[in-house]
Amino acid sequence: MSTPRTAEITRNTNETQIRVAINIDGTGQQKLNTGVPFLDHMLDQIARHGLIDLDIEAKGDLHIDAHHTVEDVGITLGQAFAKAIGDKKGIRRYGHSYVPLDEALSRVVIDFSGRPGLEFHVPFTRSMIGTFDVDLTHEFFQGFVNHALVSLHIDNLRGANAHHQCETVFKAFGRALRMAAELDPRSVGTIPSTKGSL
């Protein structure tokens, strides 16, 4: 591989200070410190199952709640991914994954289309996972989608345990990312679109 697909993005606002460094062609190494333990756990799933190296440091207004931190980590990760993947030449573009965890099953499908769109259908069985508000899962993915410029479909097909539901979503997301971002040796240097650009 001639050019490393890496990026580092810093985002500072009155609400959060975030730094994200990624290597799309990594091995799943991670260093995560967002101040939101459950978010760190979910980001670890993305790294491990996507084989993406992630280094994320975040400080936010957690004295209010975790909303700004979770959303802004999604935004910054999306920006980093867009920068690292570059012009998208040679990538597979589309990725999908089904992931089970005991009784839970989720499907994630992604398209590096250049157009942001999120379909999020996760009927969580409770509103909190420990101290984590499950509504923030949607905010994370909306932030990612808007800044990575991808079309993302997330469906939890079944599940009784909210932790399992959420974990299958993040694992499937990591695996779908890996598939879509993978370089196809049969289309080196080619944009995977009849338009010639994405």
Curated annotation (Swiss-Prot):
Source domain of life is Bacteria
Q: Which GO terms describe its cellular component?
A: cytoplasm
One of the entry's Gene Ontology molecular-function terms is: imidazoleglycerol-phosphate dehydratase activity
Provide the primary localization: cytoplasm
Catalytic activity, per the record?
D-erythro-1-(imidazol-4-yl)glycerol 3-phosphate = 3-(imidazol-4-yl)-2-oxopropyl phosphate + H2O
EC number, UniProt record: 4.2.1.19
Example GO biological process term? L-histidine biosynthetic process
Q: Which UniProt keywords apply?
A: Amino-acid biosynthesis, Cytoplasm, Histidine biosynthesis, Lyase
Identify one Pfam family in the record: IGPD
Write down the CDD domains for this protein, in alphabetical order.
Answer: IGPD
List, alphabetically, the Gene3D superfamilies matched.
Imidazole glycerol phosphate dehydratase, domain 1
Family recorded in the similarity comment: Belongs to the imidazoleglycerol-phosphate dehydratase family.
**NCBIfam families from the UniProt entry:** PRK00951.1-1 (NF002106), PRK00951.1-5 (NF002109), PRK00951.2-1 (NF002111), PRK00951.2-4 (NF002114)
- Give the protein's recorded name: Imidazoleglycerol-phosphate dehydratase
Source organism: Janthinobacterium sp. (strain Marseille)
